Structure formats: C-alpha cells, structure tokens
C-alpha cells in the first residue's frame, strides 16, 4: 500500500507488489488521510453468477479500466459496464459484480478510507 500522508505519492505496479486476495484476485492500494483508491485485478471469468451482495458505510465509485462486468445492486436493474464506464455507490447500498469477460481491472475509490483494507502490524 502507498500512503500519501503529507506529500504526493505514486503507486507504480513495477515497484508496488499486488496483494493476493485469492484465486484470480489481487489489489494495489493508494490512500491519503481521507480517500482510498484500490486497483483490483480479477481473472478467471466469465463467472456464471454474481458475487453475493455486500454493503459498507463508505461511499464508493468504481471505474472499469478493462474488461466487462455486470454491476448489481439491491432494488435496481443490473448494469452492464465496459472499459471506460464509471459507477457511483452511495453509503450502505448493497451491491456486487459478475465478471463477464475473462479478466477485468476495476479501480474503486472509497471515502472515508476503508480501515478494514489496511494491514495492521
């Protein structure tokens, strides 16, 4: 994780190794005191069904940098998103994705910072 606490910082994939989260899933994180962006690389698609819905108190935007996903949220029609699309998720709204392409890169931005994404110790 790159932390821009009191000066500008850059996240460079060649320098900052990805955190492996599971089979076909890795992320890189950059943050300030109030904002967090997460580059999420997903492989192993297409998936047969969406992930289970989840929610959190953080506001979120998701930019589809590559690939294609189906964005699902409670009470809304699923949105098919392609590279270049951006979606905003209010605090507390249950949501999930379904990978439609073989792989995708999503860039999630959260406010406030997702403390649960920060490794302790």
Walk through the language-model features, giving the residues of each.
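A generic "binding-loop/recognition-motif" signal
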Residues: 57, 77, 93-94, 102-103, ...
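A short, N-terminal "cap"/entry segment at the start of jelly-roll beta-barrel domains
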Residues: 1-38, 52
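Short beta-strand His + acidic residue motifs that chelate non-heme Fe in jelly-roll/DSBH
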Residues: 71-72, 89, 95-100
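Glycine- and acidic-residue-biased ligand/ion/polar-headgroup-sensing regions
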Residues: 57-69
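Short acidic-glycine-tyrosine-enriched beta hairpin
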Residues: 75-91
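Conserved short histidine dyad/triad with adjacent acidic residue
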Residues: 39-55
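Double-stranded beta-helix
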Residues: 3-7, 35-36, 98-121
């Amino acid at each position: 994780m790159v932390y821009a606490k009191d000066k500008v910082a850059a996240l460079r994939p060649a320098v900052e190794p990805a955190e492996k989260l599971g089979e076909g899933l890795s992320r890189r994180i950059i943050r300030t005191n109030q904002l967090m962006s997460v580059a999420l690389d997903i492989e192993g698609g297409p998936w047969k069904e969406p992930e289970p819905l989840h929610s959190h108190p953080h506001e979120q935007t998701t930019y589809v940098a590559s690939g294609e996903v189906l964005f699902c949220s409670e009470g809304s029609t699923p949105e098919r998103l392609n590279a270049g699309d951006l979606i905003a998720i209010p605090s507390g709204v249950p949501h999930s994705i379904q990978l439609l392409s073989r792989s995708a890169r999503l860039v999630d931005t959260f406010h406030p910072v997702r403390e649960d994404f920060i490794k302790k110790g």
